[in-house]
């Protein structure tokens, strides 16, 4: 697998404020996913994304890129062995797939994702 970037997401401390700002700024279509506190960003062509309340307590708002991997737990463990700090260990998104979030040795955050097939 080439491990492509597959998703971009805003993890925010104020979801309502972010939706209002980005919806008006880019004229994005925003679609709330019922019962999960997640908003899909529909952009037509290109990579879409989402917005949610930040899953890491106390962390500042930030955009986060997702890279597709074959095995989230194994890739997370490999990242840790190479010096990453795990912020959110492998977590299942029911009906969607699995993800984890880490910072690399320079402090940059990145997420890993494996869709449910």
Give the label of every model feature segment.
Residues 61, 65-80, 85:
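Mid-chain, well-packed structural core segment of small domains
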Residues 1-19, 46-47, 62-67, 113-117:
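N-terminal beta-strand motif that seeds the catalytic metal site of vicinal oxygen chelate
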Residues 27-62, 109-114:
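Conserved short beta-strand elements that form part of the metal-binding/catalytic scaffold
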Residues 40, 66, 99-101:
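Conserved hydrophobic/aromatic beta-strand scaffold that supports enzyme active sites
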Residues 3, 10, 31-32, 76-117:
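Vicinal oxygen chelate
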Residues 22:
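Catalytic core of tubulin tyrosine ligase-like
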